[in-house]
Amino acid sequence: MSAVINKEVLLSKIKEALRNGKPRRFRQSVELIVVLRDVDLNKPENRINLLVELPHPPKPNKVAAFAHGAFETQAKNAGVDAIITRDQIESLAGNKRAIRKLAKQYDFFIAPPDLMPLLGRVIGPIFGPRGKMPEVAPPNVDIKALVERLKRSVRVRLRNEAVVKVRVGSETQKPEEILENILVILEELNRRFPLRQHLRGIYIKKTMGPPVVARALEVLVR
Protein backbone atom coordinates (compact mmCIF):
# COMPACT_ATOMS: atom_id res chain seq x y z
CA MET A 1 0.00 0.00 0.00
CA SER A 2 2.95 2.31 0.66
CA ALA A 3 3.60 2.28 -3.10
CA VAL A 4 0.17 3.83 -3.73
CA ILE A 5 -0.59 6.08 -0.73
CA ASN A 6 1.61 8.87 0.61
CA LYS A 7 1.46 8.00 4.30
CA GLU A 8 3.06 11.25 5.45
CA VAL A 9 0.40 13.33 3.72
CA LEU A 10 -2.39 11.14 5.05
CA LEU A 11 -0.98 11.30 8.59
CA SER A 12 -0.89 15.10 8.44
CA LYS A 13 -4.56 15.11 7.39
CA ILE A 14 -5.45 12.87 10.33
CA LYS A 15 -3.67 15.19 12.75
CA GLU A 16 -5.48 18.17 11.26
CA ALA A 17 -8.85 16.44 11.63
CA LEU A 18 -8.08 15.63 15.28
CA ARG A 19 -7.26 19.28 15.97
CA ASN A 20 -10.36 20.61 14.25
CA GLY A 21 -13.64 21.35 15.97
CA LYS A 22 -14.75 22.23 19.47
CA PRO A 23 -14.29 19.87 22.43
CA ARG A 24 -17.38 17.76 23.11
CA ARG A 25 -18.69 16.05 26.22
CA PHE A 26 -18.34 12.65 24.60
CA ARG A 27 -15.53 10.79 22.89
CA GLN A 28 -15.88 11.48 19.20
CA SER A 29 -15.26 8.87 16.54
CA VAL A 30 -12.95 9.48 13.61
CA GLU A 31 -14.67 8.81 10.32
CA LEU A 32 -13.22 8.04 6.91
CA ILE A 33 -15.04 8.90 3.68
CA VAL A 34 -13.52 7.61 0.45
CA VAL A 35 -14.96 8.99 -2.79
CA LEU A 36 -14.30 6.90 -5.88
CA ARG A 37 -14.78 7.70 -9.55
CA ASP A 38 -15.52 5.73 -12.72
CA VAL A 39 -17.11 2.86 -10.79
CA ASP A 40 -20.21 1.44 -12.48
CA LEU A 41 -22.51 0.41 -9.65
CA ASN A 42 -24.96 -1.08 -12.14
CA LYS A 43 -22.51 -3.98 -12.31
CA PRO A 44 -23.14 -6.35 -9.37
CA GLU A 45 -19.43 -7.11 -8.99
CA ASN A 46 -18.81 -3.45 -8.12
CA ARG A 47 -21.35 -3.40 -5.29
CA ILE A 48 -19.14 -4.64 -2.47
CA ASN A 49 -19.91 -5.60 1.11
CA LEU A 50 -16.69 -6.44 2.95
CA LEU A 51 -15.56 -7.04 6.50
CA VAL A 52 -12.18 -5.49 7.24
CA GLU A 53 -10.39 -6.26 10.50
CA LEU A 54 -8.70 -3.19 11.98
CA PRO A 55 -5.27 -3.44 13.61
CA HIS A 56 -6.32 -0.82 16.19
CA PRO A 57 -10.11 -0.90 16.70
CA PRO A 58 -11.34 2.11 18.71
CA LYS A 59 -13.54 -0.15 20.83
CA PRO A 60 -14.85 -3.73 20.64
CA ASN A 61 -17.95 -4.08 18.50
CA LYS A 62 -21.10 -5.55 19.99
CA VAL A 63 -21.92 -8.95 18.49
CA ALA A 64 -25.22 -10.79 18.91
CA ALA A 65 -26.06 -14.34 17.87
CA PHE A 66 -29.30 -15.70 16.49
CA ALA A 67 -29.04 -19.17 17.92
CA HIS A 68 -30.60 -22.39 19.13
CA GLY A 69 -29.41 -25.79 20.31
CA ALA A 70 -25.69 -26.52 20.24
CA PHE A 71 -24.96 -23.30 18.36
CA GLU A 72 -26.45 -21.30 21.23
CA THR A 73 -24.01 -22.91 23.66
CA GLN A 74 -21.08 -22.32 21.31
CA ALA A 75 -22.02 -18.68 20.85
CA LYS A 76 -22.29 -18.10 24.60
CA ASN A 77 -18.87 -19.68 25.11
CA ALA A 78 -17.46 -17.49 22.33
CA GLY A 79 -18.38 -14.33 24.24
CA VAL A 80 -21.21 -12.84 22.20
CA ASP A 81 -22.99 -9.89 23.77
CA ALA A 82 -26.47 -11.35 23.36
CA ILE A 83 -28.34 -14.47 22.29
CA ILE A 84 -31.57 -14.14 20.31
CA THR A 85 -33.48 -17.43 20.30
CA ARG A 86 -35.75 -18.89 17.62
CA ASP A 87 -38.81 -17.95 19.68
CA GLN A 88 -37.55 -14.38 19.97
CA ILE A 89 -36.94 -14.24 16.22
CA GLU A 90 -40.49 -15.41 15.52
CA SER A 91 -41.88 -12.85 17.97
CA LEU A 92 -40.23 -10.09 15.91
CA ALA A 93 -42.30 -10.91 12.81
CA GLY A 94 -44.14 -7.81 11.65
CA ASN A 95 -42.72 -5.62 14.44
CA LYS A 96 -40.68 -3.16 12.38
CA ARG A 97 -39.90 -0.90 15.33
CA ALA A 98 -38.41 -3.76 17.35
CA ILE A 99 -36.41 -4.99 14.35
CA ARG A 100 -34.99 -1.51 13.68
CA LYS A 101 -34.09 -1.17 17.36
CA LEU A 102 -32.30 -4.52 17.27
CA ALA A 103 -30.35 -3.51 14.15
CA LYS A 104 -29.10 -0.38 15.94
CA GLN A 105 -28.32 -2.18 19.19
CA TYR A 106 -25.54 -4.42 17.84
CA ASP A 107 -22.78 -3.90 15.30
CA PHE A 108 -22.72 -7.45 13.95
CA PHE A 109 -24.81 -10.60 14.10
CA ILE A 110 -24.03 -14.27 13.55
CA ALA A 111 -26.35 -17.20 12.85
CA PRO A 112 -26.21 -20.88 11.84
CA PRO A 113 -27.25 -21.76 8.26
CA ASP A 114 -30.53 -23.41 9.27
CA LEU A 115 -31.87 -20.16 10.77
CA MET A 116 -31.16 -18.04 7.70
CA PRO A 117 -34.46 -18.74 5.85
CA LEU A 118 -36.43 -17.63 8.93
CA LEU A 119 -34.18 -14.61 9.43
CA GLY A 120 -34.50 -13.65 5.79
CA ARG A 121 -38.27 -13.52 6.11
CA VAL A 122 -38.45 -11.81 9.50
CA ILE A 123 -35.56 -9.33 9.57
CA GLY A 124 -34.26 -9.33 5.98
CA PRO A 125 -36.30 -6.38 4.68
CA ILE A 126 -34.90 -4.12 7.42
CA PHE A 127 -31.48 -5.66 8.13
CA GLY A 128 -30.56 -6.14 4.46
CA PRO A 129 -30.51 -2.50 3.32
CA ARG A 130 -28.61 -1.59 6.50
CA GLY A 131 -25.88 -4.14 5.84
CA LYS A 132 -26.74 -5.89 9.10
CA MET A 133 -27.70 -9.38 7.89
CA PRO A 134 -25.99 -12.03 10.05
CA GLU A 135 -22.68 -13.58 9.17
CA VAL A 136 -23.40 -17.24 8.49
CA ALA A 137 -21.40 -19.58 10.72
CA PRO A 138 -20.98 -22.99 9.01
CA PRO A 139 -20.82 -26.11 11.22
CA ASN A 140 -17.01 -26.36 11.01
CA VAL A 141 -16.25 -22.69 11.76
CA ASP A 142 -14.39 -21.60 14.90
CA ILE A 143 -17.15 -19.52 16.52
CA LYS A 144 -14.82 -17.88 19.03
CA ALA A 145 -12.42 -16.76 16.29
CA LEU A 146 -15.33 -15.45 14.23
CA VAL A 147 -16.69 -13.41 17.14
CA GLU A 148 -13.26 -12.02 17.99
CA ARG A 149 -12.75 -10.98 14.35
CA LEU A 150 -16.14 -9.27 14.22
CA LYS A 151 -15.38 -7.36 17.40
CA ARG A 152 -12.40 -5.81 15.60
CA SER A 153 -13.94 -5.30 12.16
CA VAL A 154 -15.72 -2.64 10.16
CA ARG A 155 -18.05 -3.11 7.21
CA VAL A 156 -17.01 -1.53 3.92
CA ARG A 157 -19.90 -1.13 1.48
CA LEU A 158 -20.54 0.28 -1.96
CA ARG A 159 -24.22 0.18 -2.81
CA ASN A 160 -25.99 3.18 -4.33
CA GLU A 161 -23.09 5.61 -4.69
CA ALA A 162 -19.34 5.30 -5.14
CA VAL A 163 -18.62 6.45 -1.60
CA VAL A 164 -17.33 4.44 1.36
CA LYS A 165 -18.08 5.72 4.87
CA VAL A 166 -16.56 3.94 7.85
CA ARG A 167 -15.46 4.60 11.43
CA VAL A 168 -11.69 4.22 11.69
CA GLY A 169 -10.87 5.35 15.22
CA SER A 170 -11.59 7.70 18.07
CA GLU A 171 -10.20 11.11 18.97
CA THR A 172 -8.27 9.59 21.90
CA GLN A 173 -6.23 7.28 19.69
CA LYS A 174 -2.78 8.04 18.36
CA PRO A 175 -2.79 9.44 14.81
CA GLU A 176 -0.44 6.64 13.77
CA GLU A 177 -2.98 4.02 14.89
CA ILE A 178 -5.74 5.71 12.92
CA LEU A 179 -3.42 5.83 9.91
CA GLU A 180 -2.84 2.07 10.10
CA ASN A 181 -6.59 1.48 10.30
CA ILE A 182 -7.18 3.65 7.24
CA LEU A 183 -4.42 1.93 5.28
CA VAL A 184 -5.95 -1.55 5.67
CA ILE A 185 -9.26 -0.21 4.34
CA LEU A 186 -7.58 1.50 1.41
CA GLU A 187 -5.68 -1.72 0.71
CA GLU A 188 -8.95 -3.63 0.37
CA LEU A 189 -10.40 -0.96 -1.90
CA ASN A 190 -7.23 -0.87 -3.99
CA ARG A 191 -7.51 -4.60 -4.69
CA ARG A 192 -10.93 -4.11 -6.25
CA PHE A 193 -10.69 -0.58 -7.62
CA PRO A 194 -7.06 0.41 -8.27
CA LEU A 195 -6.84 3.75 -6.52
CA ARG A 196 -4.56 5.39 -9.07
CA GLN A 197 -7.46 5.14 -11.52
CA HIS A 198 -10.47 5.31 -9.23
CA LEU A 199 -9.72 7.56 -6.23
CA ARG A 200 -11.34 10.99 -6.35
CA GLY A 201 -10.59 12.03 -2.76
CA ILE A 202 -10.50 11.17 0.93
CA TYR A 203 -12.25 12.99 3.77
CA ILE A 204 -11.34 12.53 7.44
CA LYS A 205 -13.42 14.01 10.24
CA LYS A 206 -14.45 13.68 13.85
CA THR A 207 -18.11 12.98 14.56
CA MET A 208 -18.94 16.67 15.08
CA GLY A 209 -15.93 18.17 13.34
CA PRO A 210 -15.43 19.63 9.87
CA PRO A 211 -13.98 17.30 7.24
CA VAL A 212 -10.36 17.52 6.16
CA VAL A 213 -9.95 16.85 2.46
CA ALA A 214 -7.12 14.84 0.93
CA ARG A 215 -7.41 15.14 -2.84
CA ALA A 216 -6.23 12.25 -4.98
CA LEU A 217 -3.34 14.32 -6.35
CA GLU A 218 -2.12 14.96 -2.80
CA VAL A 219 -2.38 11.49 -1.35
CA LEU A 220 -1.48 9.21 -4.27
CA VAL A 221 2.14 8.38 -5.02
CA ARG A 222 2.69 8.83 -8.74
From Swiss-Prot:
CDD domains: Ribosomal_L1. Disulfide bonds: none annotated. Coiled coil: none annotated. InterPro entries: Ribosomal_uL1, Ribosomal_uL1-like, Ribosomal_uL1/biogenesis, Ribosomal_uL1_3-a/b-sand, Ribosomal_uL1_arc, Ribosomal_uL1_CS. GO terms for cellular component: large ribosomal subunit. It holds the Pfam family Ribosomal_L1. GO terms for molecular function: rRNA binding; structural constituent of ribosome; tRNA binding. Keywords: Repressor, Ribonucleoprotein, Ribosomal protein, RNA-binding, rRNA-binding, Translation regulation, tRNA-binding. Belongs to the universal ribosomal protein uL1 family. HAMAP family: Ribosomal_uL1_A. Binds directly to 23S rRNA. Probably involved in E site tRNA release. Protein L1 is also a translational repressor protein, it controls the translation of its operon by binding to its mRNA. This is Large ribosomal subunit protein uL1. It comes from Pyrobaculum islandicum (strain DSM 4184 / JCM 9189 / GEO3).
